[in-house]
Structure formats: structure tokens, C-alpha cells
Amino acid sequence: MCYYRTTGLIVTQMQELVRRVNNALDKPWNKHSGRPKSLGLHKAVEAACMYLRQNATQEFIGDCRDTSQPTISRYTAVLVPLVKSVLEEFVPSAADAIEVVKGRVILVDGTLTPCWSYEEHQELWNKKHKTTGYNAQLISLLDGTAAWVSGPLAGKTHDAKAFKETGAADILKEAGGGFGDKGYQGTGLVTPKKKPIGGELTLSDKEYNSQISSFRAPVERLVAHFKNWKMLHTDYRRPYSTYHDAFDAARALFFFSITWGFE
């Protein structure tokens, strides 16, 4: 069976993930007696991954798997933190990223991962995008290789501030320079020139900015690839308290999908 379109994983990766989840369970997924679960572990893990990949409603996923929305809700609540845990080793830490980027030029970009407007969490409002969400920082090499993805910060956090708070600035210190967009001015990254107040950019400034943009294209592709996990691209709808586990699980699946089986 092909899993890539629904979960982002190839067959062997899904098999490996199920094996890891099974080993991490406190007790067998299906009891030896009593009523069996409506989905076996393989199908349940697939449903949880489908939720992260597609950000579809639980009712829709239940229909696809011939089970109920409450069942998908329960399985998602149990399995998403497990997916995060068993794949954590594939997510590069800042220290791992420093080893990769030493002496090499890096590309940095920030992205907003949108979520519902939780009334009690006004810090998630992002003025630039005029919506609520979280700020994540991504670093790639010039060839687009994913070096690091930060954890999420509140959506109100400006990229320049997030660059420092997430540890991306420490990674830059060990790199051989880096490029960012206008939101990173003053961080040590090479950035495009802003239009002066009441003036216009010169032709040479426009050409310079165009070159910066072309250099940054690989990290923008990385952002797009990362956000193929639709829970990072469209509004996250589950309770606020579950967001960080879901983000971490999606991030882990992203790195797992581009590394495991390709050594």
C-alpha cells in the first residue's frame, strides 16, 4: 500500500514507525481478551500521521478508516505524543546543526504556522499575517539541505527576535555567514536593503536585492516542504494544550521522512 500521499512516509518508513511505536507502548495495543480496538496499531498510527499530514477533520479520517470521529480523536491523543517521542532522535538539535554548518554559508527563514484564535492566548496574534499562530525558524545550507528547525514561539514574535531566542543566532556564529530576508536586519545575516523613507531604491540596490532573493530560494523551498505537513500550513484546530506535541511530531516526521532509509 502507498502511504506517501496520505502520511508523507514511504512504506518502509511507515513500517519502521509502527515498530517503534509498538515498542514504546506501555501495554499491547490489542488485549488478548475483551473487545478489540476498531483499528489495529498499524492503521491507527497511519491515521495519526494522516491527521498531521493532511490536517483533515477527525470525522473525515474516521470515514476513510471506517471508524468513528471519537475513536480517531482518542487515537490521535495517544499516538501523536508517541510519534514525537520515538522519532525525536531524527530532529537536529542546535548543537547538531552547528556541526553541520561549521564554516558553511547558511540560509535562514521564518514561517508562521497558523492555529485557531484561542481567546485566552492573544500572544499568538501576528500583525504581519493578520492571523494567529506560531513562529518557527528554519535553517538550510545553500543547496537546500535542512540543517535545523526551531521549536514554535508565539506568533507575535518578530523574526529577528525569534532568531535570537530560538538559538538560531548561536548557529550563525559557527557558520561561514548567512542570508536572511528584511526581517533579519541587525542580526548579522546578509539581508536585502529596505526602501528609504520617502525615497526609492537605486538600480544597483534592486539588483543587489534580487541576488539576495535568488540565494535564499533554497530555504524558501525548505519551508514549503516542511509545511507539506498541513497542520503546519492550515489552522490547527485541536486544543491549545496539544499544539506543541503536534508540532514536534510533525517536525520529527519531516526529518524522519528525509533521512531514514536514505543513509
Predicted regions: what they are:
Residues 60-77, 81-263:
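Short, well-ordered secondary-structure "scaffold" segments embedded in the functional core
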Residues 10, 40, 202-204:
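Ser/Thr-centered flexible coil motifs
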Residues 33, 42-44, 207-208:
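A short, structure-level motif marking secondary-structure boundaries and short turns
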Residues 40-54:
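Short, amphipathic alpha-helical "recognition" segments used to contact nucleic acids or chromatin
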Residues 1-35, 263:
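Charged, often Cys/His-bearing segments associated with DNA-binding zinc-finger transcription factors
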Residues 37, 51, 62:
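Short, charged/polar micro-motifs that form catalytic or ligand-binding hotspots
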